[in-house]
Amino acid sequence: MADAIEIEEMMLEDRDIAVVLEVPTRRRRSRERDYRDRRDDSYDDRARRRREDSTDSWSRSRGDENRGQTPRSDSGAKVHDAPKASAPAAQTEEQKKAERLAKLEAWKKKMAEDKERKEKELAAGGTRKLLDDIDQKANGSSSQPSPNTPTTPSTSAISGDLAPTNYAGKFDPKAIAKKAVASSSSAHALGRDLPLKELSKTSATLTSTVKGLQADKKPTAFNSTSKVSALPKTRGNLSVFGLGAKVTDNEKTYQKRALDFDEDEGSRKKLEKLPTLPMANSKEDDAALANGIEGQDDDDDAELEAAGTEEEAAAAARAAAEKREERLQEAESQPHTNGDVHMEDAPQADSTAMDEDEEIDPLDAFMEEMGDPFSLPKSNTTFVKNNTKSQPQEPEALFGDDDVDLKALDADPDEILAIANKARKKKDIPTINYANLNLPPFRKNFYTEPAELVDMTEAEINDLRLELDGIKVAGKDVPKPVQKWSQCGLDVKSLDVIKKLGYDKPTSIQMQAIPAIMSGRDVIGVAKTGSGKTIAFLLPMFRHIRDQRPLKNSDGPIGLIMTPTRELATQIHKECKPFLKAMGLRAVCAYGGAIIKDQIADLKRGAEIIVCTPGRMIELLAANSGRVTNLQRVTYVVLDEADRMFDMGFEPQVMKVFNNIRPNRQTILFSATMPRIMDALAKKTLQSPVEIVVGGRSVVAPEITQIVEVREEKEKFHRLLELLGELYNADEDARTLIFVDRQEKADDLLKDLMRKGYPCMSIHGGKDQVDRDSTIDDFKAGVVPIMIATSVAARGLDVKQLKLVVNFDAPNHLEDYVHRAGRTGRAGNTGTAVTFITEEQEQYSVGIAKALEQSGQEVPERLNEMRKSYKDKVKSGAKKESSGFGGKGLERFDAEREATKARERKIHKLNGDDDEEEKEEKDDDVLLKAASVVQPASASTAPPKLLGVPKGIDLDGDIKVHRTETAASSSGSKNPLDKVTSAIDAINARLNKTGQLRSGVPIDNKGPDAGAFHATLEINDFPQKARWAVTNRTNVAKILEATGTSITTKGSFYPAGKEVQAGGDPKLYILVEGDTEVVVTNAMRELMRLLKEGTMAAADAEGRAPASGRYTVT
């Protein structure tokens, strides 16, 4: 402590009297600045080192009550005491000035040497080596032990001993800048081992030793804050306990410097924190102030600023790089003419930024090379572009809005329609060329003729077939009929299941069909309903499948059974289950209306048998480009109800499936009816078939009692109630199946029977498949004793205890009658089939009478008369006979659907284009020509062009607006009123005569509120959707508001086929009245547009779901 005081006293001798006298004032100002400085917060490393010196001196002199000023944070912290102590004699002014000039000259000489040496090192080793050397030098000078405190109070000794050390390290601007981070850089970046805390203490000791040589005589220098404002000021509160925090700050500062000059590319990204030019100037000013130099000339300033040349160049290069990046970004934001970005523009920015230098400095070149990675955080796009110069630039146009060529599609309706049709086109089944496939052979013939049949003669075989319900066979080498199950060539497992099911012996069709199928022949089997045709083709299929190798993961089924209805497919699948469990086989039932994903999952798990409908089979084959299943392994194909399968409704789909099956398959066709017209279609898929007919073609089983009654429509329901009452009085457990011709009729009859107390359910194609399945299950289980159905339940449905079948609506052909009646009297049981027929349905009498004759029952006299009357009309050409087959197929529905959608596209045009507006005007002109005059029923008109438009209505005619006729006045003149009266009488006469409207004049258009002009439009025979479109309140209100007319719906609705009685109301029509002909025409135009749209909507709905009814959501 004493040594420090002595040194301070020696330093005070160098000050003049004026400075000493100003100490009290400067103490107060110093305290105030010290208080401010402690509150301020900055982090300049050089100033912090000086603050360490100040703190050390402050702590040593704290016990002295006459302590000097607080060390100043800007210039290096001068410490002095206020009291005047004994000191050597004061030096003269000339000596002090000479000493200062000597110090300045020495400092300038050293700075020049350092500058020359740095330039040489820069040219030889580069910036990196120079910076490492500077750090090493600064660290080395700081880590040297400080000289001991002198004990002699000699001013000259102090000056002579300490001056070289002081000016060698303290007043070097680069050394001052590096000393603050020397310890951290040596510990981390440069690999030195000096502890941070010890280094701080050493630096503090060295600084406190040379305090007296740093003193500044000018008190005004402490007020300079413009250049030192960035330096840290929080120094007054720190003591020895604050050194740890100070070391942490030094470590943080070093981390920035280490990132600046490290060779790692990732660290270079943070080069923004390099020291800048103003900081270097601030250091130089601090050095000048510390030496008391005033009024330095420009040459001195230039020499002092030379130390910052390298950092200044680095900052300039970095600024140039940033400006170049900004120019590139601005250029990219500008719209380009061609969308290409030329990467050669980057060097031009370099040259522009560096125009001041004629030659490229090596340091600038080096920093320029390091500049590209620095620009990555600024713009990632530039970095990517620099690495992809050789690649084409087209992808950049995809992500920008500049110069994008947007070409509108051609709005040609034909092309758009073609594209839409192509997109809506269903996927076709992948075709398989079996000629190129090497498929393994399979075995067909499993039958060995039993010994009992070998010795039978031809006559004995014919007698046997005659006894078996008159079996008729056709074909070559037809096997002899068997008489028991053991002769069929079946395996033991099949025979065990047959025994458990209680089948004592085969039926007639089974006795002849099973040996023929087991022999590997293609078979056509026709037998009466309920004769066991399903078992006849199932048993040989099981034997056929078990003979082949097991399925692999990608294999499809081996046996394929197709049926026309979903209910029949479900029933066949149920009959397979007892055999499948015993033989370890798997079967899948696939039909429309059910969830397809479950069926696909079952097929992927593997199934030897698939029972399906043709439509769903095509969907499965086309699903997922044919990877769901395939028909390559199918060798056994069955078509149940083959007459319907080869009708025009199913034949295209069936043949599409057949074309994907191997040609040497075995094909079996079964049905209860097989018209002759179906033979040609059926036999083209068979090879040398065996035809088996049991009991005749299309014959009702003799066990069924057939009753045909000719009744009026209103009498049918009462007669039905009588039949149901008689049946359930005799047998409460009996079942009744009622057939109707339309879905709406089924639901109406259901409501009527429910009101009468009969529990019943209905089934038709308009219901969901889940409802249809549950209804049949409940009917079979006896939950409901009565079921109302359309012809979807006419084929294949097998229900025990079904005693009565009622044809509430007569079937339209013979085969349908046979299948309907065949739902009862199955498997040898008896049943009754009652058929109602009206006088208007004489065309159906021919098939019903023929069925009665073929089954050996008497034809009622009234039915026979109707048949003869219809045949006479056919001969005369008035009527055309129909067989019930040869429909138009499913392609008709697709064609109608496409035509309807095409018409809708023409009508519903979007506004906005002149061409479309012109087309709309043309459409309006066409609508103006639509007819409003109701023609008589007897008038001959051209066939309607739009599907659903009734005959007698011409929507392509002219709208005729009539002037309203007024009643004759009794006080008027006779001559003009006679004509009016006669016209009215003529009109009334015509209306009373025919009950129809004529010339567009309504029967009640005579009142005082009648408009001056009127027109009429008959809507009775249009579809329900069309009628609703022109009569609902919303549409009518819009027309009334737009035209100011009066629109009234008049007449009565008459169902199809019912004519207007004499004196009755006319058919349903719309009356439009208005004051002018123009408003009436406009209203009629709008009504006809709505009517036409409704008609097309009805036709489209019918095309989408041809078998649907009231349950279809459109």
From Swiss-Prot:
Gene Ontology cellular component terms for the protein in this record: nucleus
Motif DEAD box: chain residues: 640-643
Biased amino acid composition, Low complexity: 141-156
Main location: nucleus
Residue sites binding ATP per the record: A527, K528, T529, G530, S531, G532, K533, T534
Pfam families per the UniProt record, alphabetical: DEAD, Helicase_C, KH_12
Free-text comment on this protein's domains from its UniProt entry: The Q motif is unique to and characteristic of the DEAD box family of RNA helicases and controls ATP binding and hydrolysis.
Species: Sclerotinia sclerotiorum (strain ATCC 18683 / 1980 / Ss-1)
Keyword ATP-binding: yes
Residue span(s) of domain Helicase C-terminal: 703-867
An MF annotation (GO) of this entry: nucleic acid binding
UniProt name for this protein: Pre-mRNA-processing ATP-dependent RNA helicase prp5
Database matches in PROSITE patterns: DEAD_ATP_HELICASE, HELICASE_ATP_BIND_1, HELICASE_CTER, Q_MOTIF
EC number: 3.6.4.13
Keyword annotations from UniProtKB, A to Z: ATP-binding, Helicase, Hydrolase, mRNA processing, mRNA splicing, Nucleotide-binding, Nucleus
Catalytic function, reaction form: ATP + H2O = ADP + phosphate + H(+)
Its job: ATP-dependent RNA helicase involved spliceosome assembly and in nuclear splicing. Catalyzes an ATP-dependent conformational change of U2 snRNP. Bridges U1 and U2 snRNPs and enables stable U2 snRNP association with intron RNA.
Motif Q motif, residue range(s) on this chain: 483-511
